[in-house]
Amino acid sequence: MEVEGALKLVGEMGVYQIYLSFLLAVLLQLYSATEAILITIVGVTPPYHWVNDSFVANGSQRNEYGGQLPAEGQHQYLVFDGNFTSIVSEWFLVGGAAYEVGVSSSVYFGGVLIGVICFGQLSDRFGRKPVYVTGLALEVTFAVMNALTPIFSMFLITRFLVGVMNGGMSLVAFVLLNECIGSSYWAIAGSLGSMCFAVGIAQFALIGYFIRSWRLLAVLVNVQGAGVLALSLCIPESPRWLYAQGRLHEAQESLVSLGRRNRKKFTSFTLRPRQKDSTHSANIITIYSNSILRHRTLVMMWVWFVCSLVYYGLTLSSGDLGGDIYLNLALSGLAELPAYPLCMYLINHKRVGRRRSLAGFLFLGGGSCLLIMLVPVKEGSGPLSVLNSQTLSLLGKLNISASFNIVYIYSSELYPTCVRNLGMGVCSMFSRIGGIIAPFIPALRSVHWALPFIVFGAAGVSAGLLSLFLPETLNVPLPETLGDLQVTSYRRLETNGELMLHRHEEPGAFTNGSSEEEEELDVMMESQSLL
């Protein structure tokens, strides 16, 4: 038998797989979230004022970058008035140097992009577990170095390395978990990880509220990472990866170990060798030379880019909405939680589906951001304006989180099996580019306080409009080959209990109405009518 059949014997989601889910989808995501949004707290600018030599107070910090800062007269010293420290107060990242805070976030997301590209190939060659464990160990190491570095340039370097490890390690951990459980539980595991990432944002805000030293905070959050690393040393290698490598004996041992830990009683089984795949390998030219795939890919690249840009942009802007930064950040994370069950319900509803759900959430997310510019923010206007800004920002975060969750599922259904991984990889790359740009958007407040939200809103609405040009994939068979894209698709429509053919034509599709395709559709419809 093959791995999928063996997993049904040993348990698709038994006691031990629940433990693996808790480790890789809960604890690990709680830790990953803290590193992903670290800069939202350690990069906050405390209140400060300038003083000159004759009015220097004890404990004030000399401005070593005075030439870059807008000082007046003989002002040579900065006094930070906040009750917390950050990289801004550590290295005087104010005035002309304020942009470097955004740079520190961008280099992190640049590292994530590199990590996603490299770690996938490394795990395919050397295995899921060793690459995941090594990546997690290096991430914890680099993160501690990041907290202890004495100079800002070294802070940027270690931040980049943390991004490489976090992005790559998280991807491999996700694959490892999915390959140890039954395929029917993949969506649940993915949604669980997304929800715990959101909780991790709120958790980081809570820790930051009590620990006001940025160095101590950056060190202590890695205690959780070290704990996950210790527990990860004893997890098994992916049986699916071992099977794909032809290491049948080791794959069988891994499956038997899962069964024992699940306390399952099962008869012995033997894995048969994997059949060679005769399909040719695809490349990026395959996608862009096909008119249908090219159309879908261009739209999805923009949608992924916007989802990442707005998601991380709103998260990083949580401190710019007034009120308590820790409360804003915690609410920004918790606001995501309702998004996941809501979008899972809507995308499977026959009257809504994938396309309308994605477009609707993007419209609502973008519209919420655009409405912020209508909220009056004037001195003495009262707390209502701040409350409205916060509420609309949280509503935007909820909707864009739902869009982000949908786009993963929707994208995988738009591509044929022969190019699915490649297509998802291209879209994911543009998502990372959105993350790299996101830290710089909040800086547009210096031009106009509402400009960042106008950018987020316009991007969200434009992505929603473009997504309407994509086909619906709910209850539509997944395409296996490029040829399947040319065949008129069918969908199960519950109208008086009968099945009806739904023509689905896209720009660039070739509908030559060949008798072969019509015969194939007739056979499929007749077979379905017997159900």
From Swiss-Prot:
One of its GO terms (molecular function) is transmembrane transporter activity. One of its GO terms (cellular component) is membrane. Keywords: Glycoprotein, Ion transport, Membrane, Transmembrane, Transmembrane helix, Transport. The chain crosses the membrane at residues 22-42, 100-120, 137-157, 161-181, 191-211, 216-236, 297-317, 327-347, 357-377, 387-409, 424-444, 450-470. GO terms for biological process: monoatomic ion transport. It is a multi-pass membrane protein. It is found in: Membrane. Glycans are attached at residues 52, 58, 83, 512. Gene3D superfamilies: MFS general substrate transporter like domains. It comes from the Eukaryota. Probably transports organic cations. Belongs to the major facilitator (TC 2.A.1) superfamily. Organic cation transporter (TC 2.A.1.19) family. This is Solute carrier family 22 member 15. The gene is slc22a15.
